[in-house]
Amino acid sequence: MGRRRKKRTNSWFTGICLILLLPVFITTLMQRMQLENLIYGKDGVQGVFTTADSEKNMEGEIRQHLENRKSLLAEQTETTDDGRKEEDDAVEIKILQIVAQEIGVDKPPETIKAQCVIARTNLYDAMQAGTKEPEKMTPERQQELWGENYDKNYQKLKSCVEATAGEVLLYDGTYIYAAYHAISSGRTRNMSELYEDADMPYLVMSECHADTTAEGYLSVFYYEKKEFLEKCRAAYPDAELTEPGQIEIKSRDAAEYVTKINVAGETYDGEQFRHALELPSACFSITEMDSHVRIVAKGMGHGFGLSQNTAEELAKEGYDYREILEYFYKGAVIGQAGNL
């Protein structure tokens, strides 16, 4: 009888303790959420991390960047010193979220710092022109991906953002088009070979030997001929396609990326064909076999600007982030965004 009473007393005591501690737990949780909202902001876009480039509309981005340069604001908005600091702080919070979306947190710090400068350049360029900002990873998504490593990863990104505070890439006093991609074909591309009217002399070829041995460098796809033709007809509904031989690569740039491809007598852009068939890059070859069509693609991404894989290798060799950026963006300089 005494044992039962003792057991019942312990149960009541445990229940009372839980009731008393519950408000404390809820308050602590709410404070944590409020703190994260204060640190991160609430305007993040739910995204999934990929070491890819913003390629869904690369031509549109390039054209928009050129228009941005033509319409630079003659007068800057006047703010107080406090107002400017608040604005800069808000931008730096966005940079952390953008970088979390654009590159793996396991990369060397100097590689991440280089990505911070790229992200800040593209963000300020978009803000100045009033165009779409780079995609951000929300705090909730960060917690989901990083799990128990959340605090460690957050602090690593935060230190990289702070180490490059306010730094952007400039050419002739304006923001550059800071293109980047995951893995090149073995060298990056000259922008002038794809768009002759693109005034981007800083986007020129850089050797990336390390990319040729990177995981994900080589992709091989096999299609049944019927399947291949169906995919091509879906992408080019006006083309009268009856056999794979009607698709022929016409030209490549110096980095071996396809620039022009003939589809049933009509010529199209290599990047357009790449996206239509969901290939990892426009550095590809097409081979018709007995009953199949084989496509071999090299690299991941459009191949312009910084190769994240080679940037990682350069960091391992001792390059700092400034040297990494100089390697990929010839003639561009690092400046402070607030000085424009």
Where does each model-flagged region fall?
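C-terminal soluble interaction/assembly domains
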Residues: 271-340
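N-terminal Lys/Arg-rich, disordered targeting/topogenic segments
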Residues: 1-11
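Extended substrate/cofactor- or partner-recognition/assembly subdomains adjacent to catalytic sites
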Residues: 92, 109, 116, 121-293, ...
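Hydrophobic membrane-insertion alpha-helices, especially the h-region
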Residues: 14-30
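Soluble non-cytosolic domains of exported or imported proteins
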Residues: 86-89, 106-117, 222-223, 301-305, ...
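Sec-exported extracytoplasmic/periplasmic mature domains
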Residues: 100-104, 117-128, 233-237, 315-319, ...
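N-terminal, intrinsically disordered, polar/charged segments of Gram-positive cell-envelope systems
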Residues: 33-89
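Zymogen propeptides
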Residues: 92-109
